[in-house]
């Protein structure tokens, strides 16, 4: 696969993930729904999570901060999977988004997944 194709796939996935995180963050900032508030604990926690999702999106999109954005998005979604699992809620959607984030990271930053040793 050539570099141009990798970039197109990487940025397309970045746009999709950015859209998902932005929509979710804005939904949480607007108040969400009662079930979500009960699962998270309080309205304050929900607003904090919404702001966190928007910050992750802002870090994910630019090339210079994209690596940190990918790492933060991976960790955030892993936490979301754990919360859904403990609350006995379906985890298929969050696992799907987590897989998209990993694939996005692979196409945008293949060095994150290489087995080459970095010289000290």
What are these regions (language model features)?
Residues 2-120:
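Membrane-interface extramembranous regions
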């Amino acid at each position: 696969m050539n570099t141009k194709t990798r970039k197109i796939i990487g940025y397309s996935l970045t746009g999709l993930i950015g859209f998902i995180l932005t929509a979710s963050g804005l939904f949480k900032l607007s108040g969400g729904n009662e079930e979500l508030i009960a699962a998270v604990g309080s309205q304050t926690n929900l607003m904090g999570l919404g702001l966190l999702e928007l910050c992750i999106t802002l870090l994910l999109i630019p090339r210079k901060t994209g690596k940190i954005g990918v790492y933060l998005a991976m960790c955030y979604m892993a936490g979301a999977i754990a919360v859904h699992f403990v609350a006995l809620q379906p985890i298929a959607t969050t696992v799907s988004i987590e897989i998209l984030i990993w694939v996005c990271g692979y196409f945008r930053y293949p060095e994150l997944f290489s087995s080459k040793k970095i010289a000290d």
